[in-house]
Amino acid sequence: LGKSVTN
């Protein structure tokens, strides 16, 4: 599982 978030 891979998650990426940009804020």
From Swiss-Prot:
It is found in: Secreted. It comes from the Eukaryota. Keywords: Secreted. GO terms for cellular component: extracellular region. Expressed by the venom gland. This is Venom peptide Ocy5.
